[in-house]
A protein has these predicted regions:
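Periplasmic OmpA-like peptidoglycan-binding domain that tethers envelope proteins to the cell wall
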Residues: 12-24, 36, 46-140
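Extracytoplasmic beta-rich ectodomain segments of secreted or membrane-anchored proteins
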Residues: 1-2, 21-33
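Extended, gly/pro-poor, charged amphipathic helical "stalk/hinge" elements that serve as dimerization
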Residues: 1-10
Length: 140
């Protein structure tokens, strides 16, 4: 499961603090995460390439990591998601999905991604159960 959220859905402008309207979205996401209780959850923060001007945040690396951490803590503290399943990561401005040459491009790059994945042992089980691709013959 892959969820990408625009920064203005979750945070106050130029901040890593969760805004009031994020609750409904995070509540729904927490439900999905809870339904996949044996899966791991990675929250990644991403920014545009505009340098941050807040004195308490050094750069876009920090901002992206702080935003991801805020979401992880909200999922844990407010919605009861097991913290052992959660990871937070900041990608800064280095994982753009489009160029930063326009306001629209910058807006699209300012996002938080939530990725729900099976643990490695579960993934290997899924591979073992997967049918062979067409054209691949089983070797005996």
């Amino acid at each position: 499961v892959y969820i990408s959220l625009a920064d203005n859905m979750l945070y106050k402008s130029g901040s890593y603090e969760i805004n009031e309207r994020a609750g409904e979205t995070l509540s729904k996401i927490a439900k999905i995460i809870t339904d996949y209780k044996d899966y791991e959850v990675l929250v990644e923060g991403n920014t545009d390439n505009v340098p941050i001007s807040r004195t308490n945040i050094r750069n876009n690396w920090d901002l992206s990591a702080l935003r991801a951490s805020s979401v992880v803590q909200e999922l844990q503290n407010k919605y009861g998601v097991d913290p052992k399943r959660l990871s937070a990561a900041g990608r800064g401005e280095y994982n753009p999905i489009t160029d930063n040459d326009s306001e629209l491009g910058k807006q699209r790059n300012r996002r938080t991604q939530i990725i729900v994945t099976p643990r490695l042992d579960q993934f290997l089980e899924l591979i073992d159960k997967a049918p062979e691709a067409e054209g691949e013959a089983a070797t005996e």
